[in-house]
């Protein structure tokens, strides 16, 4: 049996998912205490630290794809755009989209409402403190391993779908417009995700709605993780978020378009993403890699920090219904192309990152079936 699966069962049996293994320290509080050095828990091993070369923006960037004209009443209507998305999903696992249909004013309002929330006094934010059971609320770590290395970030996690998990009482009530703005923002990103899913299906020669059906039709899951990366006294020693691939289906990121931070691993090189104004960054998650039998790739990425400016980003996750098995689609497997992954529900799959924290691509790769 796979060791990672054993670890997850042990952690769950012990009940350690009900509370954090040690007192939570808010990274924002550390940053605002004018530290001259970095606490040991946030210092990454030398092999994981960003280098000066990797910090600097390069001429290389993830693809930027203009979606204007792609979606019409008659269906998907532009083969050139479709081909660019297909190439990005197979070669990069990441791409930016412009003319995506979400109003720039809504994007700005969403980001600035959350920035205002994180600027609230710590005591006010503690009202929303989370636990590792669901991660819902205000948090500062991933994984429940005692003494584990930590990332230089705080976050807020909330559910948007299914509706029975969407609880406004667990959403911040300040600033006054935040609930209304995030509710509208979530609805718009659910629509955008559904449109992109149609493209992903069609590009594999499948029915437009095949991926959506595999995710549970209208019963999909959607959630939002808002990341706050404070200034860091020694950014060359730390990471805002350790290398990982996203465990869910698809991620749509609203980046901080004033401060670079997201890096994508391409051919063993870390590429610093340069956000295009009012673009979303889309990336393939592990569940779509599994459904496509590894035709589409989830890709390792991380976040670097800096000593001069804070960063705020919003990661929207579009996920399968949590209790249905996800496995390679029958239309994409054959005698010559057997299924690479066994069936597993998303509930089972995401326990790994909730217990172990970010671990590169080790989780999805550990489930590859032996040939």
UniProtKB/Swiss-Prot annotation:
Binds 1 Fe(2+) ion per subunit. GO terms for molecular function: dioxygenase activity; iron ion binding; jasmonic acid hydrolase. Its cofactor is L-ascorbate; Fe(2+). Its EC number is 1.14.11.-. SUPFAM superfamilies: Clavaminate synthase-like. Fe cation binds at residues 244, 246, 301. It catalyses: jasmonate + 2-oxoglutarate + O2 = (1R,2R)-12-hydroxyjasmonate + succinate + CO2. GO terms for biological process: cellular response to toxic substance; defense response; negative regulation of defense response to insect; regulation of defense response to fungus; regulation of jasmonic acid mediated signaling pathway. Residues 219-320 form the Fe2OG dioxygenase domain. InterPro entries: DIOX_N (IPR026992), IPNS-like_FE2OG_OXY (IPR044861), IPNS-like_sf (IPR027443), Oxoglu/Fe-dep_dioxygenase_dom (IPR005123), Plant_2OG-oxidoreductases (IPR050295). Changing residue 157 to A: Loss of enzymatic activity. It is an enzyme of class 1 (oxidoreductase). Changing residue 225 to A: Loss of enzymatic activity. Jasmonate binds at residues 225, 350, 354. Disruption phenotype: Constitutive activation of stress-induced jasmonate-dependent responses and increased antifungal resistance to Botrytis cinerea. The quadruple mutant jox1, jox2, jox3 and jox4 exhibit reduced root and shoot growth, delayed flowering, reduced seed production, constitutively elevated jasmonate and jasmonoyl-L-isoleucine levels, and enhanced resistance to the necrotrophic fungal pathogen Botrytis cinerea and the herbivorous caterpillar Mamestra brassicae. No visible phenotype under normal growth conditions, but mutant seedlings have increased tolerance to the cytotoxic compound phenanthrene. The keyword Oxidoreductase applies. It holds the Pfam family 2OG-FeII_Oxy. Keywords: Dioxygenase, Iron, Jasmonic acid signaling pathway, Metal-binding, Oxidoreductase, Plant defense. Belongs to the iron/ascorbate-dependent oxidoreductase family. 2-oxoglutarate-dependent dioxygenase involved in the oxidation of jasmonate (JA), a stress-induced phytohormone synthesized in response to attack by pathogens and herbivores, which triggers the activation of defense responses via the JA-mediated signaling pathway. Converts JA to 12-hydroxyjasmonate (12OH-JA), an inactive form of JA. Is specific to free JA, and cannot oxidize the bioactive form jasmonoyl-L-isoleucine (JA-Ile) or other JA-amino acid conjugates. Prevents over-accumulation of JA and indirectly its bioactive form JA-Ile under stress response. This is Jasmonate-induced oxygenase 2. It comes from Arabidopsis thaliana (Mouse-ear cress).
């Amino acid at each position: 049996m796979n060791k990672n699966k054993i670890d997850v069962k042990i952690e769950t049996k012990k009940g350690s998912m009900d509370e954090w293994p040690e007192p939570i320290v808010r990274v924002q509080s550390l940053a605002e205490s004018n530290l001259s050095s970095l606490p040991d828990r946030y210092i990454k091993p030398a092999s994981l630290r960003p280098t000066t070369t990797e910090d600097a923006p390069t001429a290389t960037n993830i693809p930027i794809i203009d979606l204007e004209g792609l979606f019409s009443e008659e269906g998907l209507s532009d083969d050139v755009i479709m081909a660019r998305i297909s190439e990005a999903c197979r070669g990069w696992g990441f791409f930016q989209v412009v003319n995506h249909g979400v109003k720039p004013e809504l994007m700005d309002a969403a980001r600035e409402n959350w920035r205002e929330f994180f600027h609230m006094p710590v005591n006010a934010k503690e009202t929303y403190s989370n636990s590792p059971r669901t991660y819902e609320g205000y948090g500062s770590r991933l994984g429940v391993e005692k003494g584990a290395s930590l990332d230089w970030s705080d976050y807020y996690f909330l559910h948007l779908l299914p509706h029975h998990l969407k609880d406004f009482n667990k959403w911040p009530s300040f600033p006054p417009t935040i609930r209304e703005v995030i509710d509208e923002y979530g609805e718009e990103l659910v629509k955008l995700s559904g449109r992109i899913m149609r493209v992903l299906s069609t590009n594999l020669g499948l029915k437009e709605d095949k991926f959506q059906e595999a995710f549970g039709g209208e019963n999909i899951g959607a959630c939002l993780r808002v990341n706050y990366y404070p200034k860091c006294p020694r950014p060359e020693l730390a990471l805002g978020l350790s290398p990982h691939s996203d465990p869910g289906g698809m991620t749509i990121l609203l980046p901080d378009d004033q401060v670079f931070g997201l890096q994508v691993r391409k051919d063993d090189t870390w590429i610093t993403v340069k956000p295009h104004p009012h673009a979303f960054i889309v990336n393939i998650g592990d569940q779509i890699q599994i459904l496509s039998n590894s035709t589409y790739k989830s890709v390792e990425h991380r976040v670097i920090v800096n000593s001069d400016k804070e960063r705020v980003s919003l990661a929207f996750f579009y996920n399968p219904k949590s209790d249905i098995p996800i496995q390679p689609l029958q239309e994409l497997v054959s005698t010559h192309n057997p299924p690479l992954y066994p069936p597993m529900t998303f509930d089972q799959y995401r326990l790994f990152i909730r217990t172990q924290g970010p671990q590169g691509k080790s989780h999805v790769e550990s489930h590859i079936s032996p040939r």
